[in-house]
Amino acid sequence: MLPAGTGVDAAALPLAHAPLPASDVVSGSPTAATVALGEIRGVEVGVWEMTPGTACDREADEVFVVMSGRARIAFLEPALPSIEVGPGSIVRLAEGMRTEWTVTETLRKVYVA
């Protein structure tokens, strides 16, 4: 929990990575880590990171800002054009979207969900 009136360096925050479920992995051996920093009026704020590889996910309702790294996000359900993301990208995801993340450089994002 990040107490009010304090700050954290999101780029340097240590994260404990774990392998993604084999059923989600399309290629490579990606790992991911999340740390929740707290909630604001019931909305979680945190940092998430994924190492290179390709994996599918069922999304939560969230907005995120990419801090570092690069990836392509393919929208499988609903079918939408893929997007390329990198430092400074701001992306909106909706609950239930099915995505495929192809991370080419370890991707770290700050999310609000």
What are these regions (language model features)?
Residues 1-47:
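A short, N-terminal "cap"/entry segment at the start of jelly-roll beta-barrel domains
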Residues 39, 75-77:
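Short acidic, glycine-rich loop/turn motifs
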Residues 40-59, 95:
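Conserved short histidine dyad/triad with adjacent acidic residue
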Residues 46, 81-83, 99:
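Short beta-strand segments
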